[in-house]
């Protein structure tokens, strides 16, 4: 049910944990054809706030429906909420820099929304804010927890992740995943190559040029936390791990990426080679959604969406605690049917 890579072990996950969801936006998601993490490029800026609202409340306030792809595939926040319903951990939403603010309680890192990485993603002032405040958040969480799980929501985040990995010296071109079964590699490459021109030499300044607020928020929280960490995400979390490694070479021994089988088995990306380069362990949930009663859920098995909002890590946490595949899929279907019935989902 859970595959282990590079020395990852599931036993470390059998303790109380807090779920941290770091949200933000990047104007890269407005580039047509780059992401399907929203029904239109403009709506992608609503996705992180709506994801956070749905995980906490079971409904969205910022928009009148949960985020869907242009073809109606539901957000992975649905999988996350279903998995966490069996565990009920503390859930904390952290705003690293979202264009649309969620209508729920959240911690603000005093960052800013990411701009177009082909010009300049973030100001150094805001980069410093995000890093300093997220490190402090991680330190505070250490007072209560030995384990945290960090998820992310930022449309076009795989593109900024690829730029981040390349800026930090990793062989990442064309190796990141996509929410679409048709990974727009050529467009990503073009955007990233333009972003990487005339990079400064300083690491933090490089990140300000080509990264995004969420990667910095995830990395900072991890750097400040004293216990074990499950980075719940796909190729984006390899970029977060690369940032962590850039500033603390000893930290990755306490960190594991928790993702989905759809990420590690993605033929159009190579998440495992990225993890190996960075030096981070990986766990993958083998959750099988082919038995779902709903086509929108079964679409995950065809390469749609794949990961996000901590879906893989949350499934791992549920499976480790004895929840069966069938039980988890039934819960996902139940939540999905509630959304369809409440008109909180347009399909």
From Swiss-Prot:
SUPFAM superfamilies: Nicotinate mononucleotide:5,6-dimethylbenzimidazole phosphoribosyltransferase (CobT). CDD domains: DMB-PRT_CobT (cd02439). GO terms for molecular function: nicotinate-nucleotide-dimethylbenzimidazole phosphoribosyltransferase activity. InterPro entries: Nict_dMeBzImd_PRibTrfase, Nict_dMeBzImd_PRibTrfase_arc, Nict_dMeBzImd_PRibTrfase_sf. HAMAP family: UPF0284 (MF_01086). Belongs to the UPF0284 family. This is UPF0284 protein YN1551_0030. The lineage of its organism: Archaea, Thermoproteota, Thermoprotei, Sulfolobales, Sulfolobaceae.
